[in-house]
Amino acid sequence: MAETDSKAPAKAKPAALRKGALVKVNRSAYNDSLEAAASDPTAPDYIFEGPGELLLVKGDYGQVRWNRPVPDVWLRMDQLESCG
């Protein structure tokens, strides 16, 4: 069999966030999401300013703990960005 060079060009992918990473929420990705619709009409500023610690990653979602006396939250990974 002859080998063919039909490889698709690799897309540049941002660095994946891992457990323990310091993150904040991307405001534009969050505002029109299902998570925003299910929450208070105005999200607290601290989630957009960060940092929050990424505790766990399961599939497309990450669990974030803020350095405040508030519950941990699950958000889609595409709504999170690195704080560093």
From Swiss-Prot:
Reaction it catalyzes: a plastoquinone + NADH + (n+1) H(+)(in) = a plastoquinol + NAD(+) + n H(+)(out); a plastoquinone + NADPH + (n+1) H(+)(in) = a plastoquinol + NADP(+) + n H(+)(out)
Subcellular location: Cellular thylakoid membrane
Transport in keyword set: yes
EC number: 7.1.1.-
Listed GO MF terms: oxidoreductase activity, acting on NAD(P)H, quinone or similar compound as acceptor; quinone binding
Primary localisation category: membrane
GO cellular component term, pick one: plasma membrane-derived thylakoid membrane
Keyword NAD: yes
Ranges in a coiled coil: none
Transmembrane segments: none
Membrane topology: Peripheral membrane protein
Keywords associated with the record: Membrane, NAD, NADP, Plastoquinone, Quinone, Thylakoid, Translocase, Transport
One Pfam family recorded for the sequence: NdhO
Superkingdom assignment: Bacteria
Family under the similarity heading: Belongs to the complex I NdhO subunit family.
Function: NDH-1 shuttles electrons from an unknown electron donor, via FMN and iron-sulfur (Fe-S) centers, to quinones in the respiratory and/or the photosynthetic chain. The immediate electron acceptor for the enzyme in this species is believed to be plastoquinone. Couples the redox reaction to proton translocation, and thus conserves the redox energy in a proton gradient. Cyanobacterial NDH-1 also plays a role in inorganic carbon-concentration.
HAMAP family (alphabetical): NDH1_NDH1O
Subunit structure: NDH-1 can be composed of about 15 different subunits; different subcomplexes with different compositions have been identified which probably have different functions.
Protein name (record): NAD(P)H-quinone oxidoreductase subunit O
UniProt organism field: Parasynechococcus marenigrum (strain WH8102)
Gene: ndhO
